[in-house]
Amino acid sequence: MARTDNDTWDLASSVGATATMVAAARAVATRAPDAVIDDPFAEPLVRAVGVDFFTRLATGDLTPTDLDPDATGGAGNMDRFADGMAARTRFFDDFFSDAADAGVRQAVILASGLDSRAYRLPWPAGTVVFEIDQPGVITFKSDTLARLGAKPTADHRTVPVDLRDDWIGALEAAGFDRTEPSAWIAEGLFGYLPPEAQDRLLDQITELSPPGSRLAVEGVVSSPDADDEQIRERMQAVRDQWRQFGFDLDFSELVYTGERAEVAAYLGERGWRTDSITATALLEKCGLQSAEDSSANFADVRYVTAVK
Protein backbone atom coordinates (compact mmCIF):
# COMPACT_ATOMS: atom_id res chain seq x y z
CA MET A 1 0.00 0.00 0.00
CA ALA A 2 1.38 3.41 -1.00
CA ARG A 3 2.25 6.00 1.65
CA THR A 4 -0.22 8.71 2.69
CA ASP A 5 0.26 11.89 4.73
CA ASN A 6 -1.12 10.45 7.96
CA ASP A 7 -0.42 6.74 7.56
CA THR A 8 0.32 4.60 10.60
CA TRP A 9 1.79 1.15 11.04
CA ASP A 10 2.80 -1.55 13.45
CA LEU A 11 6.01 -3.59 13.36
CA ALA A 12 4.50 -6.16 10.99
CA SER A 13 3.30 -3.77 8.29
CA SER A 14 4.37 -0.91 6.04
CA VAL A 15 7.38 1.11 7.30
CA GLY A 16 7.20 -0.70 10.63
CA ALA A 17 8.01 -4.01 8.94
CA THR A 18 11.29 -2.53 7.71
CA ALA A 19 12.30 -1.97 11.35
CA THR A 20 11.67 -5.67 11.98
CA MET A 21 13.62 -6.54 8.84
CA VAL A 22 16.60 -4.51 10.07
CA ALA A 23 16.42 -6.13 13.51
CA ALA A 24 16.43 -9.56 11.84
CA ALA A 25 19.54 -8.50 9.92
CA ARG A 26 21.15 -7.43 13.20
CA ALA A 27 20.38 -10.86 14.61
CA VAL A 28 22.04 -12.48 11.58
CA ALA A 29 25.04 -10.15 11.95
CA THR A 30 25.33 -10.89 15.67
CA ARG A 31 25.69 -14.62 14.92
CA ALA A 32 28.35 -14.05 12.25
CA PRO A 33 31.96 -15.17 12.80
CA ASP A 34 34.04 -12.22 14.01
CA ALA A 35 30.85 -10.20 14.42
CA VAL A 36 31.29 -6.43 14.42
CA ILE A 37 28.14 -5.89 16.54
CA ASP A 38 26.48 -7.65 19.45
CA ASP A 39 22.75 -7.07 19.73
CA PRO A 40 21.35 -9.74 22.09
CA PHE A 41 17.87 -8.21 21.92
CA ALA A 42 17.46 -8.32 18.14
CA GLU A 43 16.37 -11.96 17.90
CA PRO A 44 13.85 -11.94 20.80
CA LEU A 45 12.31 -8.68 19.60
CA VAL A 46 11.86 -10.07 16.09
CA ARG A 47 10.34 -13.26 17.49
CA ALA A 48 7.90 -11.17 19.52
CA VAL A 49 6.71 -9.29 16.42
CA GLY A 50 5.70 -12.64 14.97
CA VAL A 51 6.35 -12.25 11.24
CA ASP A 52 7.34 -15.82 10.36
CA PHE A 53 9.78 -14.86 7.61
CA PHE A 54 11.77 -12.53 9.84
CA THR A 55 11.57 -14.88 12.81
CA ARG A 56 13.10 -17.69 10.76
CA LEU A 57 15.88 -15.36 9.60
CA ALA A 58 16.57 -14.04 13.09
CA THR A 59 16.76 -17.51 14.63
CA GLY A 60 18.81 -19.03 11.81
CA ASP A 61 16.08 -21.40 10.67
CA LEU A 62 16.14 -19.61 7.31
CA THR A 63 19.65 -18.83 6.12
CA PRO A 64 20.97 -16.23 3.67
CA THR A 65 21.87 -19.11 1.35
CA ASP A 66 18.24 -20.25 1.35
CA LEU A 67 17.21 -16.79 0.13
CA ASP A 68 19.87 -16.53 -2.55
CA PRO A 69 20.91 -20.09 -3.50
CA ASP A 70 22.56 -18.93 -6.73
CA ALA A 71 24.66 -16.35 -4.83
CA THR A 72 23.62 -13.55 -7.15
CA GLY A 73 24.67 -10.96 -4.60
CA GLY A 74 21.76 -8.68 -5.48
CA ALA A 75 19.75 -6.46 -3.17
CA GLY A 76 17.91 -9.46 -1.74
CA ASN A 77 21.11 -11.18 -0.62
CA MET A 78 20.79 -11.37 3.17
CA ASP A 79 24.52 -11.81 3.80
CA ARG A 80 25.19 -8.48 2.11
CA PHE A 81 22.20 -6.84 3.75
CA ALA A 82 23.23 -8.11 7.21
CA ASP A 83 26.76 -6.83 6.64
CA GLY A 84 25.37 -3.45 5.65
CA MET A 85 23.21 -3.28 8.76
CA ALA A 86 26.13 -4.42 10.93
CA ALA A 87 28.32 -1.61 9.58
CA ARG A 88 25.50 0.89 9.98
CA THR A 89 24.80 -0.23 13.54
CA ARG A 90 28.48 0.00 14.43
CA PHE A 91 28.66 3.50 12.96
CA PHE A 92 25.88 4.79 15.19
CA ASP A 93 27.11 2.84 18.23
CA ASP A 94 30.54 4.44 17.83
CA PHE A 95 28.93 7.85 17.36
CA PHE A 96 27.21 7.61 20.74
CA SER A 97 30.42 6.37 22.35
CA ASP A 98 32.35 9.33 20.94
CA ALA A 99 29.64 11.76 22.08
CA ALA A 100 29.76 10.30 25.59
CA ASP A 101 33.55 10.64 25.64
CA ALA A 102 33.06 14.31 24.74
CA GLY A 103 30.81 14.78 27.77
CA VAL A 104 27.39 14.75 26.09
CA ARG A 105 24.78 13.29 28.45
CA GLN A 106 21.58 13.68 26.41
CA ALA A 107 20.91 11.26 23.55
CA VAL A 108 17.93 11.26 21.18
CA ILE A 109 17.06 8.34 18.91
CA LEU A 110 14.63 9.41 16.19
CA ALA A 111 12.20 6.79 14.82
CA SER A 112 13.83 4.19 17.06
CA GLY A 113 11.93 1.12 15.85
CA LEU A 114 13.47 -1.98 17.45
CA ASP A 115 16.68 -0.15 18.41
CA SER A 116 17.95 -1.48 21.77
CA ARG A 117 20.82 0.93 22.42
CA ALA A 118 19.21 2.20 25.62
CA TYR A 119 19.59 -1.37 26.91
CA ARG A 120 22.84 -2.62 25.39
CA LEU A 121 25.29 0.30 25.23
CA PRO A 122 27.50 1.18 28.25
CA TRP A 123 26.19 4.70 28.85
CA PRO A 124 28.05 6.91 31.35
CA ALA A 125 26.30 7.69 34.62
CA GLY A 126 23.84 10.54 34.28
CA THR A 127 23.04 9.94 30.62
CA VAL A 128 19.41 10.37 29.55
CA VAL A 129 18.36 8.48 26.41
CA PHE A 130 15.17 9.60 24.66
CA GLU A 131 13.50 7.34 22.10
CA ILE A 132 10.93 8.75 19.70
CA ASP A 133 8.57 6.62 17.61
CA GLN A 134 4.90 5.97 16.99
CA PRO A 135 3.03 5.06 20.19
CA GLY A 136 2.29 1.47 19.17
CA VAL A 137 5.94 0.80 18.34
CA ILE A 138 7.18 2.29 21.62
CA THR A 139 4.65 0.35 23.70
CA PHE A 140 5.36 -2.96 21.98
CA LYS A 141 9.11 -2.72 22.40
CA SER A 142 8.98 -1.50 25.99
CA ASP A 143 6.55 -4.25 27.01
CA THR A 144 8.55 -6.95 25.21
CA LEU A 145 11.86 -5.94 26.77
CA ALA A 146 10.23 -5.76 30.20
CA ARG A 147 8.95 -9.33 29.79
CA LEU A 148 12.48 -10.37 28.86
CA GLY A 149 13.75 -8.84 32.09
CA ALA A 150 15.91 -6.32 30.23
CA LYS A 151 16.97 -3.22 32.13
CA PRO A 152 18.03 0.08 30.54
CA THR A 153 21.67 1.05 31.01
CA ALA A 154 20.77 4.75 31.13
CA ASP A 155 17.93 6.99 32.27
CA HIS A 156 15.62 5.81 29.50
CA ARG A 157 12.65 7.96 28.50
CA THR A 158 10.27 6.97 25.74
CA VAL A 159 8.50 9.61 23.67
CA PRO A 160 5.51 8.02 21.91
CA VAL A 161 4.80 10.49 19.12
CA ASP A 162 4.84 10.58 15.34
CA LEU A 163 7.56 12.85 13.93
CA ARG A 164 4.86 14.47 11.79
CA ASP A 165 3.17 15.72 14.99
CA ASP A 166 4.43 17.96 17.81
CA TRP A 167 7.36 15.76 18.70
CA ILE A 168 9.36 18.68 20.10
CA GLY A 169 6.67 19.40 22.68
CA ALA A 170 6.49 15.71 23.57
CA LEU A 171 10.29 15.48 23.84
CA GLU A 172 10.51 18.47 26.16
CA ALA A 173 7.61 17.15 28.22
CA ALA A 174 9.71 14.00 28.74
CA GLY A 175 12.50 16.13 30.21
CA PHE A 176 14.66 17.08 27.23
CA ASP A 177 16.73 20.20 27.99
CA ARG A 178 17.42 22.27 24.88
CA THR A 179 20.06 24.28 26.76
CA GLU A 180 22.28 21.21 27.19
CA PRO A 181 24.33 19.57 24.40
CA SER A 182 22.70 16.51 22.92
CA ALA A 183 23.60 13.64 20.59
CA TRP A 184 21.03 12.83 17.90
CA ILE A 185 20.77 9.96 15.46
CA ALA A 186 18.53 9.50 12.43
CA GLU A 187 19.25 5.92 11.34
CA GLY A 188 17.41 4.46 8.37
CA LEU A 189 14.89 7.29 8.48
CA PHE A 190 15.38 9.81 5.70
CA GLY A 191 14.42 7.55 2.80
CA TYR A 192 10.95 7.30 4.35
CA LEU A 193 10.58 11.08 4.57
CA PRO A 194 9.61 13.42 1.73
CA PRO A 195 12.49 15.80 0.90
CA GLU A 196 10.79 18.77 2.54
CA ALA A 197 10.18 16.76 5.72
CA GLN A 198 13.88 15.87 5.84
CA ASP A 199 14.78 19.58 5.67
CA ARG A 200 12.24 20.46 8.34
CA LEU A 201 13.55 17.77 10.69
CA LEU A 202 17.15 18.93 10.27
CA ASP A 203 16.05 22.51 10.96
CA GLN A 204 14.23 21.39 14.11
CA ILE A 205 17.25 19.45 15.36
CA THR A 206 19.44 22.49 14.70
CA GLU A 207 17.05 24.68 16.69
CA LEU A 208 17.24 22.28 19.66
CA SER A 209 21.02 21.87 19.58
CA PRO A 210 23.30 24.29 21.45
CA PRO A 211 27.06 24.34 20.87
CA GLY A 212 28.66 21.00 21.69
CA SER A 213 25.74 19.01 20.27
CA ARG A 214 26.30 16.20 17.80
CA LEU A 215 24.27 14.55 15.05
CA ALA A 216 24.68 11.37 13.02
CA VAL A 217 22.54 10.68 9.98
CA GLU A 218 22.18 8.09 7.25
CA GLY A 219 21.65 10.42 4.31
CA VAL A 220 20.09 9.36 1.02
CA VAL A 221 21.86 10.80 -2.02
CA SER A 222 19.64 12.39 -4.67
CA SER A 223 19.41 10.50 -7.91
CA PRO A 224 18.07 11.20 -11.42
CA ASP A 225 14.63 9.90 -12.34
CA ALA A 226 16.17 7.04 -14.31
CA ASP A 227 18.12 5.91 -11.25
CA ASP A 228 14.96 6.18 -9.13
CA GLU A 229 13.27 3.75 -11.48
CA GLN A 230 16.19 1.33 -11.17
CA ILE A 231 15.98 1.55 -7.38
CA ARG A 232 12.27 0.74 -7.49
CA GLU A 233 12.93 -2.19 -9.81
CA ARG A 234 15.49 -3.59 -7.36
CA MET A 235 13.03 -3.25 -4.50
CA GLN A 236 10.33 -5.02 -6.47
CA ALA A 237 12.80 -7.78 -7.36
CA VAL A 238 13.46 -8.33 -3.66
CA ARG A 239 9.73 -8.49 -3.05
CA ASP A 240 9.42 -11.18 -5.72
CA GLN A 241 12.39 -13.08 -4.29
CA TRP A 242 11.12 -13.05 -0.71
CA ARG A 243 7.47 -13.65 -1.57
CA GLN A 244 8.18 -17.35 -2.12
CA PHE A 245 9.12 -17.54 1.57
CA GLY A 246 5.81 -16.07 2.68
CA PHE A 247 6.70 -12.39 3.03
CA ASP A 248 5.08 -9.93 0.63
CA LEU A 249 5.88 -6.24 0.98
CA ASP A 250 6.59 -3.81 -1.84
CA PHE A 251 9.41 -1.67 -0.45
CA SER A 252 9.16 0.65 -3.45
CA GLU A 253 5.81 1.93 -2.13
CA LEU A 254 7.33 2.96 1.20
CA VAL A 255 10.13 5.32 0.17
CA TYR A 256 10.34 8.81 -1.26
CA THR A 257 12.80 9.19 -4.12
CA GLY A 258 13.77 12.20 -6.19
CA GLU A 259 15.78 15.33 -5.49
CA ARG A 260 16.58 16.14 -1.86
CA ALA A 261 19.15 18.19 -0.01
CA GLU A 262 22.59 16.71 0.52
CA VAL A 263 22.73 16.33 4.30
CA ALA A 264 26.33 17.38 4.96
CA ALA A 265 26.01 20.52 2.83
CA TYR A 266 22.62 21.39 4.34
CA LEU A 267 23.97 21.10 7.88
CA GLY A 268 27.15 22.96 7.00
CA GLU A 269 25.07 25.94 5.91
CA ARG A 270 23.42 25.91 9.34
CA GLY A 271 26.49 26.04 11.49
CA TRP A 272 27.46 22.37 11.83
CA ARG A 273 30.94 20.98 11.14
CA THR A 274 30.44 17.79 9.18
CA ASP A 275 32.22 14.67 8.07
CA SER A 276 30.90 11.81 5.96
CA ILE A 277 31.73 8.32 4.77
CA THR A 278 30.26 6.24 1.97
CA ALA A 279 28.55 2.92 2.64
CA THR A 280 31.35 1.13 0.76
CA ALA A 281 34.07 2.81 2.81
CA LEU A 282 32.19 2.07 6.03
CA LEU A 283 31.96 -1.63 5.17
CA GLU A 284 35.68 -1.71 4.47
CA LYS A 285 36.41 0.13 7.73
CA CYS A 286 34.48 -2.58 9.58
CA GLY A 287 36.37 -5.34 7.77
CA LEU A 288 33.30 -6.37 5.78
CA GLN A 289 33.06 -7.02 2.06
CA SER A 290 31.42 -4.31 0.01
CA ALA A 291 29.09 -4.95 -2.90
CA GLU A 292 30.85 -5.41 -6.23
CA ASP A 293 28.32 -3.27 -8.03
CA SER A 294 25.49 -0.89 -7.22
CA SER A 295 22.83 -3.49 -8.05
CA ALA A 296 23.39 -4.89 -4.56
CA ASN A 297 22.08 -1.66 -3.00
CA PHE A 298 18.64 -0.12 -2.76
CA ALA A 299 20.07 3.40 -2.82
CA ASP A 300 23.24 5.45 -2.54
CA VAL A 301 23.75 6.58 1.06
CA ARG A 302 26.27 8.62 3.01
CA TYR A 303 26.83 8.37 6.74
CA VAL A 304 27.20 11.88 8.09
CA THR A 305 28.43 13.08 11.48
CA ALA A 306 28.10 16.69 12.57
CA VAL A 307 29.25 18.77 15.53
CA LYS A 308 27.84 22.17 16.41
From Swiss-Prot:
EC class name: transferase
Disulfide bond residue pairs: none
Gene Ontology molecular function terms on file: methyltransferase activity
UniProt binding sites for S-adenosyl-L-methionine: 133, 162-163
UniProt keywords, alphabetically: Methyltransferase, S-adenosyl-L-methionine, Transferase
Keyword S-adenosyl-L-methionine in annotation: yes
Domain of life assignment: Bacteria
GO biological process: methylation
A Pfam entry, by short name: LCM
EC number per UniProt: 2.1.1.-
Family designation: Belongs to the UPF0677 family.
NCBIfam families: mthyl_TIGR00027
Function according to Swiss-Prot or TrEMBL: Exhibits S-adenosyl-L-methionine-dependent methyltransferase activity.
Name of protein: Putative S-adenosyl-L-methionine-dependent methyltransferase Mjls_1073
Organism annotation: Mycobacterium sp. (strain JLS)
Top-level taxonomy: Bacteria, Bacillati, Actinomycetota, Actinomycetes, Mycobacteriales
